[in-house]
Amino acid sequence: CPNLVFINDQPILLYCPQGLSKDVLDYGNIYPNMYKIGQSFDINNAALINPSPIQNLDFGFDCYATQAFNAPDGRALAVSWLGLPDVEYPSDRFDHQGVFSLVKELTLKDGKLYQYPVPAIKDLQAASQPFTSLSESKNSYELELNLAADTEHEIVLFADKDGKGLRINFDLKAGQVTVDRSQ
């Protein structure tokens, strides 16, 4: 599933190199999402000129097969597949496995590729449609966080009396969000 997009005239090759040795680059997914940034692209030989080293696009363990394209306005947009075919999920018993991610806009900054949900996602949140045939869940909500730059934070969801639950860590210095389901 290789994809080539351009950001500010720089070619970005996105791909999932199955079987890549972790000696080349450490990753936590059996089908890693990777990318290289080229200085330019040789269309006659289908080659990146002066490519960067291979880099992780996504550190998630269930995310792969990113599909990207340049929109008519020039933005580089992408969606990724969430859920791996070789992994069993609780939803398998309902004949459902996997889903596409939100549409993301890709940007370059200091030689790294960044992914941000497209702003149009907010337009979808404005309208609500109640489903009267569904039972209400007390574990569903939307949480908007405003965190100061260069800080670290943790929230724990669905915690039991011992504080064990789904831990979400925000490291704004490193630009990483970590989800820990081990407790």
Question: What role is predicted for each listed range?
Answer:
Residues 31-183:
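Beta-rich accessory regions
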Residues 1-5, 10-23, 76-82, 86:
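Hydrophobic core segments of beta-strands in well-ordered, beta-rich domains
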Residues 7-8, 20-42:
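Acidic, glycine-rich loop-and-beta core segments that form the ion-binding/anion-interacting portion
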